[in-house]
Design a protein with these regions (language model features):
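Membrane-embedded beta-strands of outer-membrane beta-barrel proteins
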Residues: 108-110, 140-142, 207, 252-254, ...
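Sequence/structural signature of outer-membrane beta-barrel proteins
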Residues: 81-87, 127-131, 149, 164-168, ...
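The canonical Cys-X-X-Cys-His
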Residues: 37-46
Length: 449
């Protein structure tokens, strides 16, 4: 097993840069040590991406709360487990793995997560991918934020520099941090989705400006630009994966939130308009415009139980001029719609039972969605729908947990069932595979220290 030298060099450079930064607050290896609070203060299940009200405020204010001291603002994370699909895949999902029943280390990540000054904070991640077997640049969000008062209103204003549209978002109803928060790279997944749902992750760099006014109205706008082939090679993502974004890709976000006793509500909209060159050497382009609605509900009584519900509906308009001209699509325009709804019951911030429903649908295209083993469509359709059930346990992360704040662990069992996959239930790919053959089981462990 070998690791690309440029990616290793990038990881080392990232560490050295932050260690050399003049830390007014003395950076720490984790946000828990920085704030002095347990992980349960920010996370609904004491560990993982799902945020509490305090967690959203911490992120909004640039990761700058707290004055804890430690010389190294570093943390490590590991994700892995056992994955199995109902029917073995036609070929191994990645080199060095079998077509089914795989035990794997999926991710090993190094985090730089700390405040850098009273108004600047960072969340930066470099990850070793267990299926691809190399290091690469991962989610990064560097923020400047400060409180302001004007015209009788209190506000927080800030700027985020990040490399994944929605990674900077405060809610778990947008793609970057959505349920089920973890998945296996070694089982089948739907072959398509909106551009905003991770297609550009780490392939772009953007800046957005945001504000939250009077704790209710959130507004954000900015733009993303594509990164060069050379940059992607240097950070372990490879030029062949470049999306070749042309010009700037505008991003917007608006939301309204309110709290009534033990009930929290938010609803909003977000979107992205991106033009891409499928062939980086040719000028022809495809344009994707994503517009979405989303909502969150949290019930957090004084007792041990809590309920979290998230929902989103993304509509994507596709202008496929480049693909149509190249014969890669049989019509120049198309669309996608992606609906996701999830609900979780959480007990003592240690146990969780969640159910998520997903439905992706779009216009038929017999070339764009052609028959192929496993990933293809006999009907020329992207339509995929199903459900994901997830049971989890977090033994640490509370105020009285042992080894706090140095270690946290999340273990779980995830089961995904498909009613339809790429346009069909039986023989959906034209090679005899059924949608239920892609049903999968994932037993996982998620460790941070």
């Amino acid at each position: 097993m070998s690791t690309p030298a440029p990616a290793c060099a990038f990881t080392i450079l990232l560490v050295l840069v932050l260690l050399a930064f003049p830390h007014g607050a003395h950076a720490v290896p984790s946000y828990a040590r920085q704030t002095g609070f347990p992980c349960s203060q920010c996370h609904t299940l004491s560990f993982g991406p799902a945020l509490t009200a305090y967690g959203r405020q911490f992120k909004l204010n640039g990761y700058t709360f707290g004055t804890g001291e430690h010389p190294l603002p570093l943390a490590l994370m590991m994700q892995g487990g056992f994955s199995r699909s109902e029917t073995p895949q036609p070929a191994a999902p990645a080199p060095h793995f079998a077509s089914n029943d795989n035990l794997s280390l999926d991710q090993l990540s190094l985090f730089l997560a700390t405040r850098l000054s009273d108004h600047i904070g960072v969340f930066a991640q470099a990850t070793y991918s267990g299926d691809a077997r190399h290091f690469n640049w991962d989610n990064t969000d560097i923020r400047y934020a400060r409180p302001l008062s004007f015209a009788g209103a209190d506000a927080v204003v800030g700027v985020s520099i990040n490399n994944n549209p929605t990674v900077q978002d405060l809610w778990n109803s947008t793609p970057a941090w959505a349920y089920p928060y973890i998945s296996s790279p070694l089982v089948p997944h739907g072959s398509t989705g909106p551009i905003i749902s991770g297609t550009l992750a780490q392939l772009v760099l953007g800046a957005t400006a945001y504000t939250l006014v009077d704790e209710h109205v959130y507004l954000e706008a900015g733009a993303y630009r594509g990164l060069s082939d050379r940059w992607l090679d240097n950070v372990g993502l490879y030029a062949a994966n470049n999306a070749h974004v042309r010009g700037g890709a505008p991003y917007w976000r608006a939301a309204y939130q309110l709290t009534a006793d033990e009930h929290y509500f938010s609803f909003g909209t977000f979107g992205l308009d991106v033009t891409m060159r499928p062939d980086g050497a040719a000028p022809a382009t495809n344009r994707y415009t994503d517009a979405a609605l989303d909502a969150t509900y949290q019930y957090t009584p004084k007792g041990p139980g809590a309920i979290v519900v998230n929902a989103s509906l993304i509509h994507e308009r596709q202008q496929l001029g480049a693909s149509f001209s190249a014969g890669a699509a049989d019509k120049p325009t198309n669309h996608l719609d992606a609906l996701e709804v999830d609900a979780s019951f959480i007990w003592r911030q240690a146990w969780s039972a969640g159910l998520g429903l997903f439905d992706v649908s779009g216009g038929r295209d017999l070339v764009l969605y052609a028959p192929a083993p496993l990933s293809g469509s006999l009907a020329g359709s992207p339509d995929t729908r199903g459900a994901t059930l997830q049971l989890e346990y977090v033994p640490f992360g509370k105020i009285d947990s042992p080894l706090r704040p140095w270690v946290n662990l999340r273990i779980g069992l995830q089961y995904t069932a498909y009613a339809s996959f790429n346009g069909g239930a039986a023989n959906y790919d034209g090679f005899g595979r059924s949608a239920s053959g892609n049903d999968s089981l994932f037993l996982f462990a998620w460790l941070a220290f």
